């Protein structure tokens, strides 16, 4: 199944990107949320709670959803370990629904790029818009094209606390320059005492966006005041060597819920 975080994929993600690990995004998102109205915050594709949990600990009212029950299990366990309460549900980008409106919706580290069909992506942006309160903000990280076209065939490994070995082999099998997508085969392996005990093969597809292209998509969805920033320096225009590009946009205050 494409873009599904199963048992081994979620395990590897939790080892590689544990709760609290920051790539510069945690401080940035906290700083940007200080400029938002008080109220509930939504993190789609919440994963293991790497961003959500530090925000909860800082006093923000954050809730999240994810398409992977395995990832949500890690997030729930991390919340329990810290005596935190969070609303976490299994939902998808295409169908998520809440009976409330949020003052901010945040998507760190390129999660939005899991939506690879342009029409679907535009519909998701409109869905975000509809779930924001007037004056609410959408903050989205996108990886630039350079992050998609690097070397393929990498092999990475992680040791668990019990001494097991997890490996990930990443092999890109297609780059579509018209659709602006890459497709990779990800092979996860779980080893115990030199014996292979489990294997998981996933198809992983991502889409890159041009800066102006995504800005136009935000405006087409109804957003205003689009600010594009490079490398978590708010208001600094992206540069060619930046590793992350952040878009912040606002639902107009004069519209009703």
Pin down the residues of each PLM region.
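Class I SAM-dependent methyltransferase SAM/SAH-binding core
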Residues: 52-95
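A short acidic, Gly/Pro-enriched loop at the edge of an enzyme's catalytic core
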Residues: 95-104
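Class I SAM-dependent methyltransferase "Motif I" SAM/SAH-binding loop
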Residues: 45-48
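SAM-dependent methyltransferase
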Residues: 139-213
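Conserved class I S-adenosyl-L-methionine
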Residues: 1-39
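C-terminal lobe and adjacent flexible extensions of AdoMet/dcAdoMet transferase-like proteins
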Residues: 205-257
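A short SAM/SAH-binding and catalytic strip from SAM-dependent methyltransferases
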Residues: 103-119
């Amino acid at each position: 199944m494409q873009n599904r975080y199963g048992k081994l994929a979620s395990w590897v993600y939790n080892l590689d990107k544990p709760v609290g690990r920051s790539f510069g995004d945690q401080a940035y998102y906290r700083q940007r949320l200080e400029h938002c109205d008080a109220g509930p915050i939504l993190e789609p594709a919440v994963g293991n709670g790497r961003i959500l949990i530090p925000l909860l600990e800082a006093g923000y009212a954050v809730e999240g959803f994810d398409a992977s029950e395995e990832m949500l299990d890690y997030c729930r366990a991390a919340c329990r370990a810290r005596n935190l309460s969070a609303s976490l549900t299994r939902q998808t980008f295409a169908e998520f629904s809440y009976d409330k409106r949020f003052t901010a919706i945040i998507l760190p580290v390129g999660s939005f790029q899991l939506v690879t069909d342009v029409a679907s992506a535009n519909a998701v942006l409109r869905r975000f818009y509809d779930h924001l309160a007037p004056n609410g903000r959408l903050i989205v990280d996108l990886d630039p094209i350079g992050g998609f076209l690097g070397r393929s065939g990498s092999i990475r490994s992680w040791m668990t606390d019990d001494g097991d070995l997890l490996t990930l082999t990443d092999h890109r099998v297609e780059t579509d320059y018209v659709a602006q997508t890459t497709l990779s085969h990800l092979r996860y392996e779980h080893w115990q005492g030199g014996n292979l005990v489990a294997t998981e093969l996933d198809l992983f597809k991502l889409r890159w966006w041009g800066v102006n292209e995504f800005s136009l998509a935000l405006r087409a969805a109804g957003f205003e005041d689009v600010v594009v920033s490079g490398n978590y320096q708010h208001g600094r225009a992206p540069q060619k060597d930046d590793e992350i590009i952040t878009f912040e946009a606002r639902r107009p205050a004069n519209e009703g819920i």
